[in-house]
């Protein structure tokens, strides 16, 4: 049955084709004409600029004072080594930064598999080449990896640090986004007699630290949260009325189920009487890790989901919970 001419079509089919563990194609149809490019471009920009991830931010190499130099017995110069280190695909669980070490001697390639780290760190591309040793030499370095979002150039971080930064500590341009490549294509779609519709095909490749399907879901959630502000706009022709400012951000009043956490994480929170997002953000990492069956992986998931909404753990909320929530409990 055909609906009103003023109604918009809503996508009825979402097909996910997993090309390989790091690449997926997502097809969404049907869309009104023009909406393919509107949604495709918005999701593409969010995936490239707003997804949280981990990246190398600092490096110290024994015997090296600055990046515009070379090291005896190493085929690559220091700038090339730093560029190769930026290609490390790393995840950190339960904390925001980690220090890795690399020491190797001999002749041949030095890869990510030669890096020493603790159990909270996982390197997804151990075959990634960092440099090549020649003439039976050695190399030692310390690598700092941090969690973040977007792109942070080394020059921006250098301006915020003290002037007495140790010589030899090399800052690295940090690209935290786990999305390596994203492209979209808009094709023709048809519903009954209508042939002027759009089909959106998103082709995405990640660095292996996040599932492509999960990345698209998170980017769509970020977009929806940002558009909520426009949904709440009032007609400017209405007379001004003094309204009491909400005591809390509306997102804090939502149930934790709206975060779409895994079943394990959601059940752990409910067992601790954490029913609303406002309840959750007031907990600290230490408090959550004391929750039975909630481990570091679940904690990382919770932090990432909160970060995508501009929230974090350890927030202080005065007069929480509001009376409306107390009445509902």
Swiss-Prot record:
Q: Which GO terms describe its biological process?
A: DNA-templated transcription
Q: Where is this region: Alpha C-terminal domain (alpha-CTD)?
A: 248-329
> Which Enzyme Commission number(s) are on file for it?
2.7.7.6
A Pfam family found in this protein is RNA_pol_L
Q: Where is this region: Alpha N-terminal domain (alpha-NTD)?
A: 1-234
Which Gene3D superfamilies is this protein grouped with?
5' to 3' exonuclease, C-terminal subdomain, DNA-directed RNA polymerase, insert domain, RNA polymerase, RBP11-like subunit
| Recorded superkingdom | Bacteria
InterPro entries assigned to the protein according to its UniProt record, in alphabetical order: DNA-dir_RNA_pol_insert, DNA-dir_RNA_pol_RpoA/D/Rpb3, DNA-dir_RpoA, RBP11-like, RNAP_asu_C, RNApol_insert_sf
Sample GO molecular function, one term: protein dimerization activity
Keywords from UniProt, A to Z, are: DNA-directed RNA polymerase, Nucleotidyltransferase, Transcription, Transferase
- A GO cellular component entry from the record: cytoplasm
Q: Which reaction does it catalyse?
A: RNA(n) + a ribonucleoside 5'-triphosphate = RNA(n+1) + diphosphate
Q: What does this protein do?
A: DNA-dependent RNA polymerase catalyzes the transcription of DNA into RNA using the four ribonucleoside triphosphates as substrates.
Q: How does it assemble?
A: Homodimer. The RNAP catalytic core consists of 2 alpha, 1 beta, 1 beta' and 1 omega subunit. When a sigma factor is associated with the core the holoenzyme is formed, which can initiate transcription.
Q: Which family does it belong to?
A: Belongs to the RNA polymerase alpha chain family.
Which HAMAP family does UniProt cross-reference here?
RNApol_bact_RpoA
Question: What does the comment on domains in this protein's record state?
Answer: The N-terminal domain is essential for RNAP assembly and basal transcription, whereas the C-terminal domain is involved in interaction with transcriptional regulators and with upstream promoter elements.
Supply the name of the protein: DNA-directed RNA polymerase subunit alpha
Query: What is the species of this protein?
Result: Shewanella denitrificans (strain OS217 / ATCC BAA-1090 / DSM 15013)
């Amino acid at each position: 049955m055909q609906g009103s001419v003023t109604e918009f079509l809503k996508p009825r089919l979402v097909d996910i084709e997993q090309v390989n563990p790091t690449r997926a194609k997502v097809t969404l149809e049907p869309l009104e004409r023009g909406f393919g490019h509107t949604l495709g471009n918005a999701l593409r920009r969010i995936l490239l600029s707003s997804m949280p991830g981990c990246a190398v931010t600092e490096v110290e190499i024994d015997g090296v004072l600055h990046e515009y130099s070379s090291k005896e017995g190493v085929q690559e110069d220091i700038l090339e080594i730093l560029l190769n280190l930026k290609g490390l695909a790393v995840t950190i669980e339960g904390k925001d930064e980690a220090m890795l070490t690399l020491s190797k001697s001999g002749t041949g390639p030095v890869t990510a598999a030669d890096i020493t780290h603790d159990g909270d760190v996982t390197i997804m591309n151990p075959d990634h080449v960092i440099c090549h040793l020649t003439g039976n030499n050695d190399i030692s370095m310390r690598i700092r990896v941090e969690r973040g979002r977007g792109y942070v150039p080394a020059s921006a971080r250098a301006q915020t640090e003290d002037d007495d930064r140790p010589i030899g500590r090399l800052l690295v341009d940090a690209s935290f986004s786990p999305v390596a490549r994203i492209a979209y294509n808009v094709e023709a779609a048809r519903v009954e007699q209508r042939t002027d519709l759009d089909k959106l095909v998103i082709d995405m490749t990640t660095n292996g630290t996040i599932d492509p399907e999960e990345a698209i879901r998170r980017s769509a959630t970020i977009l929806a949260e940002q558009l909520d502000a426009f949904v709440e706009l009032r007609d400017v022709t209405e007379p001004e009325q003094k309204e009491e400012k909400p005591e809390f951000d509306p997102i804090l009043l939502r149930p934790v189920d709206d975060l779409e956490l895994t079943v394990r994480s959601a059940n752990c929170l409910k067992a601790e009487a954490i029913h609303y997002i406002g309840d959750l953000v007031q907990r600290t990492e230490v408090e959550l890790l004391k929750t039975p069956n909630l481990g570091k992986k679940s904690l990382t998931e919770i932090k990432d989901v909160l970060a995508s909404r501009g929230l974090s753990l350890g927030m202080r909320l005065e007069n929480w919970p509001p009376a409306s929530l107390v009445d509902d409990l």
